[in-house]
A protein has these predicted regions:
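Hydrophobic transmembrane alpha-helices and their helix-loop junctions in integral membrane proteins
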Residues: 101-145, 151-450, 454-457, 468, ...
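Hydrophobic alpha-helical transmembrane segments
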Residues: 77-95, 214-228, 417-421, 499-522
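Transmembrane helix-loop-helix hairpins at membrane boundaries of multipass inner-membrane proteins
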Residues: 1-6, 23-121, 194-214, 218, ...
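Membrane-interfacial helical/loop segments at transmembrane boundaries in membrane proteins
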Residues: 61-76, 201-210, 399-406, 479-505
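Hydrophobic alpha-helical membrane-embedded segments
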Residues: 344, 423-432, 518-538
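Aromatic-capped, Gly/Pro-kinked transmembrane alpha-helices
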Residues: 75, 83, 478-514, 528-633
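N-terminal signal-anchor/start-transfer transmembrane helix
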Residues: 11-26, 100, 229
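Hydrophobic alpha-helical membrane-insertion segments
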Residues: 39-56, 180-190, 384-388, 461-480, ...
């Protein structure tokens, strides 16, 4: 079968799984729900692999598959069509491959949950919309997938909606994403007005003939970037992502590794032709990316919830990716999307294994000494930690250092922020590992006796992801190490902008050495502090230094937003309700009712209830009409 015949099955199968599990959530057995939910994603992955290898052997690297003409009004023509090229083919493998491992993991992790069928139907729908997002051949189809993953994140973050805090976290994610989505939508409208189309195949060739610095292009790219900030959790719109930990742990893994948060990176990489012509926008992206990476890393330093540490690490790593996009390292950023998907899915699922073993305890202050109890979880998570810390030869080393090298070429200041962030990343990640797995168990002996390794359905995905986190960097080994940068050549076939490094090998080695040394120093400091020194984070109410307090309270960003946005809007809405709605609008409506009522009281006096009087008036009226007829007509 050809690519054109196969591609529509990739998103269709998860949608079928959503329908079957959604309709049969209360009637199908949990075993059957798990088989259907995981099976459709596995089938999509297998088809994606076939498409990927077919594309490799094809001289034509881009296939636009038309399904049907969806909207046609005047000059606006929007077909429902898919674009299969090197960029989307890699995303298909990430979404379906890691998505399948998360589904498999969930069959065990969520087995005792009453909403098992509903959970799998939501997961399938999430994957469907993400596939629609990356396959769309125009910005409208992409936007449908974009909004769909936002809806599914709301459903999954608030899956345990009976807990009011979890329900609030879901609403927060939904609302903050809508802010970014408005920017994306305005950017699409402006694009249609400027280019006369929303199709990639028509916009990008026109843009390629334009000179850099066009004001309209700058405005379009800024609006698109605002959309990416919301979906991919960048300053100032990142505070929803840590709260998304309210959902079940497999949801966290899916959102943070394989789907939602990578959408903004993908959209900018897909639109790299436009962003390359807007250097002002790129500069903003680089600054915000670097700032987000640093701020989130500082916040992660003092968190005690194992999932919150990983959540802020995701925000920080996304900041790295945006830094790369801003300095023109589109391939490096996408490379980091790929490696991050491996080690972040591994770390979240590993954290889920710990939480499962600890009977839903997430506070690292109550853990410790779990290495012997959870050997597979410990070993696999350690591989993921080494990868995210950027130590060679694990995957994160290659992708992170490619971004840092481009950052150095663009601005040594941004590179310096990146290196500081690398140091902090290694410190808080090894801090998490040491507090969780080394030292002595900080709970009771009775609790410790019930800690055990997770079942095979949960550990198998960990092992697979650990292998990928260890060797995944091989996909784009740089020339300085004798590699051929396969990924860069592959993405060039999708029109992703390429910017070569203009650095000597000695400079590249020095830059890599600096970041590696920073990570090793951070590792040793964390070991000295939390293993040799047996330090445990202080209780929530204990006094902290000013910087630690700032970090622990997340720079008070939620409180600031509450003060400058939420409270004024709340006060305005109360004023509007009490004055405009209650007194003015209700006054008009109620005043009309009162006037009608008072007028009816006077008219009511004519209704005496005397039948004789009614007959008299009827006769009088008839006589009057007859006289009028004879006299005047």
């Amino acid at each position: 079968m050809t690519i054109e015949q196969l591609i529509w099955l990739v998103p269709l199968l998860p949608f079928i799984g959503f329908v079957i599990n959604g309709l049969g959530r209360n009637t199908l057995s949990k075993g059957l729900v798990g088989i259907i939910g995981s099976g459709v994603i596995l089938a999509s992955f297998i088809i994606s692999v076939v498409i990927f290898f077919s594309l490799q052997g094809d001289t034509q690297k881009s296939h636009e598959v038309f399904l049907f003409d969806w909207i046609s009004a005047g000059t606006l023509h929007i077909p429902l069509s898919f674009l299969v090229d090197p960029l989307s083919s890699i995303m298909l493998l990430i979404i379906t491959g890691i998505g399948f491992l998360i589904h498999l993991y969930s069959t065990s992790y969520m087995h005792d949950d009453a909403g098992f069928g509903k959970f799998f139907s939501y997961l399938n729908l999430f994957v469907f919309f993400m596939l629609l997002l990356v396959l769309g051949s125009n910005y409208i189809v992409m936007f449908i997938g974009w909004e769909g993953v936002g809806l599914c994140s709301y459903l999954l973050i608030g899956f345990w909606y009976t807990n009011s805090a979890y329900a609030s976290a879901a609403k927060k994610a939904f609302v903050m994403n809508r802010i970014g989505d408005l920017g994306f939508l305005l950017g699409v409208f402006l694009m249609f007005n400027f280019f006369g189309s929303v199709e990639f195949s028509k916009i990008f060739p026109q843009a390629a003939n334009m000179l850099p610095g066009n004001n309209t292009l700058i405005l379009i790219t800024i609006l698109l970037f605002i959309g990416a900030c919301g979906k991919s959790a960048q300053l100032p719109l990142f505070t929803w992502l840590p709260d998304a930990m309210a959902g079940p742990t497999p949801v966290s893994a899916l959102i943070h590794a394989a789907t939602m948060v990578t959408a903004g990176i993908y959209m900018i990489a897909r639109s790299s032709v436009l962003f390359d012509l807007a250097p002002f926008t790129q500069h903003i992206i680089a600054i915000i990316g670097a700032a987000t990476a640093l701020v989130a890393a500082i916040i992660a330093l003092t968190q005690t919830d194992i999932k919150k540490v990983l959540a802020y690490s995701t925000v920080s790593q996304l900041g790295y990716m945006f830094l790369g996009l801003g300095v023109g390292a589109y391939t490096g950023s996408f490379f980091h999307v790929l490696t991050h998907a491996f080690f972040k899915a591994l770390l979240f699922l590993g954290a889920g294994s710990v939480i499962h073993a600890m009977h839903h305890e997430q506070d690292m202050r109550h853990m410790g000494g779990l290495r012997k109890k959870l050997p597979v979880t410990f070993l696999t998570m350690m591989i993921g930690t080494i990868a995210i810390a950027g130590l060679p030869p694990f995957s994160g080393f290659f992708s992170k250092d490619e971004i840092l090298a481009h950052a150095f070429q663009y601005s040594p200041v941004l590179w310096g922020i990146g290196v500081i962030t690398a140091f902090l990343t290694a410190f808080y990640m090894f801090r998490m590992m040491f507090l969780t797995f080394l030292g002595k168990y900080r709970g009771t002996h009775h609790e410790e006796s019930h800690v055990h390794e997770s079942p095979a359905a949960m550990t198998t995905p960990l092992i697979i992801l650990a292998v990928l986190a260890a060797i995944g960097g091989a996909i784009n080994i740089p020339h300085v190490f004798g590699g051929n940068e396969w990924l860069a050549h592959w993405l060039a076939g999708a029109g992703v902008a390429q910017h070569e490094l203009d650095l000597s090998h000695s400079t590249e080695y020095a830059l890599m050495g600096t970041s590696v040394v920073a990570a090793i120093i951070a590792l040793l400091y964390a070991y000295t502090r939390y293993v040799k020194g047996s330090r445990v984070p202080v209780a929530d109410e204990a006094p902290r230094s000013a910087l630690a307090k700032l970090s622990y309270n997340k720079f008070y960003l939620d409180e600031i937003y509450d003060f400058i946005i939420t409270k004024p809007l709340d006060a305005f809405s109360r004023f509007f309700y009490r004055v405009v709605d209650t007194k003015f609008i209700d006054g008009i409506v109620n005043g009309l009712g009162w006037s009608t009522n008072e007028a009816s009281k006077g008219i009511r006096l004519l209704q005496s209830g005397n039948v004789g009087f009614y007959i008299f008036m009827m006769v009088f009226g008839i006589v009057a009409l007859l006289l009028y007829t004879f006299l005047y007509i």
